[in-house]
């Protein structure tokens, strides 16, 4: 059984027992329960439910594990004939959520 949920302007495929990494959910602390009610798609035992735009009565329940930063992404801008370059780095915040159950 899996579902596709919408959160923070993006859609994610989730399954029970798996960990979902999303944009930082600043309203929740580690250990809090989070409920996704914007379920776009559910597949259970070969049965497919597609929402218009969301599946009625479906929700996904998870538990916030942590807030952390992802690995650093480095960018380099090289200026030819100037013998110089600019290096920049960025680390994006994310929230790790363990999916506990998918309810219909």
From Swiss-Prot:
The keyword Acetylation is assigned to this record: no
Keywords attached to this entry: Ribonucleoprotein, Ribosomal protein, RNA-binding, rRNA-binding
GO biological process: translation
Keyword RNA-binding applies: yes
Gene Ontology molecular function: rRNA binding; structural constituent of ribosome
Superkingdom: Bacteria
SUPFAM superfamilies, sorted: L21p-like
GO CC terms, sorted: cytoplasm; ribonucleoprotein complex; ribosome
NCBIfam families hit by this protein: L21 (TIGR00061)
UniProt function note: This protein binds to 23S rRNA in the presence of protein L20.
HAMAP family cross-referenced by the UniProt entry: Ribosomal_bL21
Assembly and binders: Part of the 50S ribosomal subunit. Contacts protein L20.
Descriptive protein name: Large ribosomal subunit protein bL21
Organism, as annotated: Thermotoga petrophila (strain ATCC BAA-488 / DSM 13995 / JCM 10881 / RKU-1)
Highest classification ranks of the organism: Bacteria, Thermotogati, Thermotogota, Thermotogae, Thermotogales
């Amino acid at each position: 059984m899996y579902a596709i949920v919408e959160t923070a302007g993006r859609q994610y495929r989730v399954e029970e027992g798996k960990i979902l990494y999303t944009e930082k959910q600043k309203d929740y602390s580690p250990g809090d329960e989070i409920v996704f009610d914007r379920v776009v798609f559910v597949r259970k035992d070969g049965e497919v439910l597609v929402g218009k735009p969301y599946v009625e009565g479906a929700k996904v329940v998870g538990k916030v594990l942590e807030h952390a930063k992802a690995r650093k992404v480095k960018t380099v801008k090289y200026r030819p004939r100037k013998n110089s370059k600019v290096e920049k780095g960025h680390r994006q915040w994310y929230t790790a959520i363990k999916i506990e159950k998918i309810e219909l």
